[in-house]
């Protein structure tokens, strides 16, 4: 639809393994509602997270060790879960959780 919210979703450093090994997705979300990072995380959990949700989600947020960047800016500087997503935002999730 013309009023859909279009985003680029990127997953790297192992986060993509939880989402079917797809590192980059173009999303088109229902533009009739307000989308925040928090609502995007719920959508991701319900629609594209394919395994081990406990490695990505903890409560209502990402697990510690998952960095979130919005247009190359740390999401915490933008309001964290409450950041309202904008047309053509690039959301990047980077896992810093590694075995050893």
From Swiss-Prot:
Sites of the Glycyl lysine isopeptide (Gly-Lys) (interchain with K-? in acceptor proteins) crosslink: 100
Cite the Pfam families for this sequence: Urm1
- Superkingdom of this protein's organism: Eukaryota
Query: What cellular component terms from Gene Ontology apply here?
Result: cytosol
One Gene Ontology term from the biological process aspect of the record: tRNA wobble uridine modification
Q: Where in the cell is it found?
A: Cytoplasm
Main location as per UniProt: cytoplasm
Please list the residues that carry the modification 1-thioglycine.
Answer: 100
Chain's role? Acts as a sulfur carrier required for 2-thiolation of mcm(5)S(2)U at tRNA wobble positions of cytosolic tRNA(Lys), tRNA(Glu) and tRNA(Gln). Serves as sulfur donor in tRNA 2-thiolation reaction by being thiocarboxylated (-COSH) at its C-terminus by MOCS3. The sulfur is then transferred to tRNA to form 2-thiolation of mcm(5)S(2)U. Also acts as a ubiquitin-like protein (UBL) that is covalently conjugated via an isopeptide bond to lysine residues of target proteins such as Prx2/Jafrac1, Ciao1, Eip71CD and GILT1.
Q: What quaternary arrangement does the UniProt entry report?
A: Interacts with cer.
Q: Which family does it belong to?
A: Belongs to the URM1 family.
This one is known as: Ubiquitin-related modifier 1 homolog
- What species was this sequence derived from? Drosophila willistoni (Fruit fly)
Q: What is the lineage of its organism?
A: Eukaryota, Metazoa, Ecdysozoa, Arthropoda, Hexapoda
């Amino acid at each position: 639809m013309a009023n859909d919210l279009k985003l680029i979703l990127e997953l790297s450093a192992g986060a993509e393994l939880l989402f079917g090994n797809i590192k980059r997705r173009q999303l088109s979300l229902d533009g009739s509602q307000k989308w925040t990072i928090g609502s995007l995380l719920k959508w991701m959990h319900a629609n594209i997270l394919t395994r081990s949700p406990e490695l990505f989600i903890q409560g209502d947020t990402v697990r510690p060790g998952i960095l979130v960047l919005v247009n190359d800016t740390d999401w915490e500087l933008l309001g964290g879960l409450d950041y309202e997503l904008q047309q053509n935002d690039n959301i990047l999730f980077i896992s810093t959780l590694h075995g050893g």
